[in-house]
A protein has these predicted regions:
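N-terminal alpha-helical interaction blocks
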Residues: 1-87
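Short connector loops at helix/strand junctions that flank enzyme active sites
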Residues: 38-40, 105, 123, 142
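A structural signal for short hydrophobic beta-strand segments in well-ordered beta-sheet cores
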Residues: 45, 117, 147-150
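Short, intrinsically disordered, charge-biased short linear motifs at domain edges
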Residues: 93-101, 111-119
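Residues immediately within or flanking Cys/His clusters that coordinate Zn2+
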Residues: 104-107, 114, 125
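Short, non-ligating residues that shape and space the ligands of small metal-coordination modules
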Residues: 119-120, 139
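N-terminal strand-loop-strand
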Residues: 126-170
Length: 174
């Protein structure tokens, strides 16, 4: 279906256009064909209205190849850096794509027996390929909380990870 949408992820970076106001690059039809052919993993993210949306993992490509795969449109950016500039729906789409593809990269082998796993159910399950094992692996759904601790006025508590860029602070989570 030419309306089918694909969002690309490369080494945990999201495919976007623009610097000051980044927007996800959504590949469709012929524009998606090379990326789809080269993707290590293709995962169904869901429906946007009646249009299917998939995530493409291009992490196996060299940095000199990845832009060719997406038609030399946009750049790949760290979602933590561009996230605050994205609207809620775009940020959610890119975060979901990144998270599910990261899960796939980390679960290519069965945690029980060590055999390779294969994606099933649109990419939301990985099944052990060893016949006498066959364990189903699912993405983790850990409970988490994000909070804003404030004094009821203008002041709040923010945290900062040493790995984050200078000047980047966040609300607390855990």
């Amino acid at each position: 279906d030419p309306a089918t949408a694909f969002v690309a992820v490369w080494q945990d970076s999201s495919h976007v256009t623009g610097v000051d106001s980044p927007q996800p690059v959504v590949l469709r039809g012929e524009d998606a064909s090379l990326a789809l052919e080269l993707a290590e993993e293709v995962v169904f993210l869901g429906l946007d209205g009646e249009r299917a949306v998939f995530a493409l993992d291009l992490s196996g490509l060299a940095d000199s190849e990845v832009l060719d795969a997406v038609g030399n449109r946009g750049t790949f950016q760290d979602l933590r850096r561009i996230g605050p500039q994205l609207d809620r729906a775009d940020g959610a789409l890119l975060a979901y794509a990144r998270a599910v593809l990261r899960w796939h990269r980390g679960h290519r082998f069965c945690g029980r027996c060590g055999a390779p796993t294969a994606a099933k159910d649109g990419g939301h399950v990985r099944i052990c390929t060893r016949a006498n094992c066959g364990v189903s692996h699912h993405p983790r759904t850990d409970p988490a909380v994000i909070m804003l601790v404030h004094d009821g006025g203008e002041h709040c508590v923010l945290g900062r990870q040493p790995r984050h860029p200078s000047g980047m602070h966040t609300v607390l989570a855990g």
